[in-house]
């Protein structure tokens, strides 16, 4: 077992555990959007940032991918963490103004507006890749993937062409943290629209 501290409270977890998993075991809340227990974590959304301190030295780490280690000191609500979280929420509100899920989570942490320019009022996708990982790791397919790059990056079928690889299992719709895949699923399939039966995760 590994012993370390979260918010000055000593905790004990199994080796190989991440900081986020440890925090959840002890009922310590850390916000996330791109994390799901069923797939490999990626740290894409960065909402789960926490502060790792060692004396006068400290750094921010993504708790969903940072492994626990003996004797480390983790803080989840320092001023630095809250400032970074605030900025991330503001960027997500500008990137995904159409997502009620993001708005609700941001409001829970005191963020109700953004200083950044909004390009598309209907956009919901934050391009975290959770849906693509679920399609590959849970379903065993790669019907969807990251398309394009930079500010043009989005989620879609390879080469932005309808594909027969999609089996309409609904896994991507179920796991999507922002609700974006609800409106995108029919653009992926090459067959007519179907009624999805979401996969229980």
Please give the residue ranges for each predicted region.
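N-terminal cofactor/phosphate-binding cores enriched in small/glycine residues
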Residues: 11-60, 64, 69-70, 83-84
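A generic secondary-structure micro-motif detector
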Residues: 9-10, 162
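Fe-S ferredoxin-like electron-transfer domains
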Residues: 46, 50, 56-168, 174, ...
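Extreme N-terminal starter segment of soluble prokaryotic enzymes
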Residues: 1-3
């Amino acid at each position: 077992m590994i012993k370390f501290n979260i918010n000055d409270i000593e905790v004990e977890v199994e080796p190989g555990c991440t900081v986020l998993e440890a925090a959840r075991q002890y009922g310590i809340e850390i916000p996330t959007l791109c994390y799901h227990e069923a797939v490999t974590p990626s740290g894409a959304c960065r909402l789960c940032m926490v502060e790792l301190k060692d004396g006068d030295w400290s750094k921010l780490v993504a708790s969903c991918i940072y492994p626990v280690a003996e004797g480390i000191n983790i803080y989840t609500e320092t001023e630095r963490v809250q400032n970074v979280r605030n900025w991330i929420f503001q960027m997500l509100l500008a990137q995904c103004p159409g997502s009620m899920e993001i708005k609700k989570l941001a409001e829970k942490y005191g963020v109700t507006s953004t200083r950044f320019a909004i390009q598309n009022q209907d956009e919901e996708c934050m391009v975290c890749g959770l849906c693509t990982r679920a399609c590959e790791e849970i379903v065993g397919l790669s019907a969807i993937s990251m398309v394009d790059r930079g500010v043009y990056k989005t989620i879609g079928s390879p080469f932005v062409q309808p594909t027969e690889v999609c089996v309409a299992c609904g896994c991507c719709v179920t796991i999507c943290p922002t609700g974006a895949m609800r409106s995108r699923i029919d653009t992926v399939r090459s067959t007519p629209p179907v009624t999805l039966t979401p996969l229980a995760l």
